[in-house]
């Protein structure tokens, strides 16, 4: 019997500099699971090594605002003078295919998604071992002016207070460890009764004594 398995929408969120992209990429390399990354859109400039359509859809302010008007985003937010958003259609297509869809989004965007109460959605809050690690990582990027780093740290202090609203909190002490924890979370989510009961009932329908 072929069992139906719906994909999960996995929201990986946390303060800027916590390592969301690094952990997600490591997770994808560690397993051949049915994972896909939903590429977000932004109006900020690409960082060194980032590719349009792979890391982000890099849009102009006018293009992004037109997308807002046309209801093209599942969620969107403005962060330090730049828009960030999640294109809606690609996520819907992936979930219909039974794929596990990963979103890396800002805390404000995750807050908007929680209010939508979407089914089969798991919210994971990624945190550093120490707050100072955020400053060190942002500084190491070399892409931010000091004033922007200070703004991001101030925003992060407020975002930490929202961690209790997430389904899971994962500490990014080591990238591989954080990725392992997220894989374990996904397996546990699929085993929950509310997601597996229909397939279990289908198994019970089989007559194992049939000749």
From Swiss-Prot:
SMART domains: GuKc
Stretches assigned to the Guanylate kinase-like domain: 7-187
GO MF term list: ATP binding; guanylate kinase activity
One Pfam family this sequence matches: Guanylate_kin
InterPro entries: GK/Ca_channel_bsu (IPR008145), Guanylate_kin-like_dom (IPR008144), Guanylate_kinase (IPR017665), Guanylate_kinase_CS (IPR020590), P-loop_NTPase (IPR027417)
UniProt EC number: 2.7.4.8
Catalytic activity line of the entry: GMP + ATP = GDP + ADP
Main location: cytoplasm
Subcellular location: Cytoplasm
UniProt protein name: Guanylate kinase
Organism: Aster yellows witches'-broom phytoplasma (strain AYWB)
Gene label: gmk
């Amino acid at each position: 019997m072929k069992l139906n398995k719906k994909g999960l929408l996995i929201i990986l969120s946390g303060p800027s500099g916590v390592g969301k992209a690094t952990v997600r990429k490591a997770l994808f390399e560690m397993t051949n699971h049915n994972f896909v990354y939903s590429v977000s859109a932004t109006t900020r400039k690409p960082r060194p090594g980032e590719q349009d359509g792979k890391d982000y859809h890099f849009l102009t302010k006018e293009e992004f605002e037109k997308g807002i008007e046309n209801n093209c985003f599942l969620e969107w937010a403005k962060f330090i003078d730049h828009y960030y958003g999640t294109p809606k259609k690609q996520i819907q297509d992936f979930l219909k295919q039974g794929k596990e869809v990963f979103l890396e989004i800002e805390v404000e965007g995750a807050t908007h998604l929680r209010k939508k109460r979407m089914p089969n959605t798991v919210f994971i809050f990624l945190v550093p071992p120490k707050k100072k690690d955020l400053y060190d990582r942002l500084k190491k990027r070399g892409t931010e002016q000091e004033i922007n780093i200070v703004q991001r740290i101030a925003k992060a202090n407020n975002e930490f207070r929202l961690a209790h609203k997430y389904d899971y909190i994962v500490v990014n002490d080591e990238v591989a460890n954080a990725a392992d924890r997220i894989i374990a979370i996904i397996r546990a989510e699929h085993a929950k009764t509310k997601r597996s009961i229909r397939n279990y009932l289908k198994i019970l329908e089989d007559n194992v004594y049939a000749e």
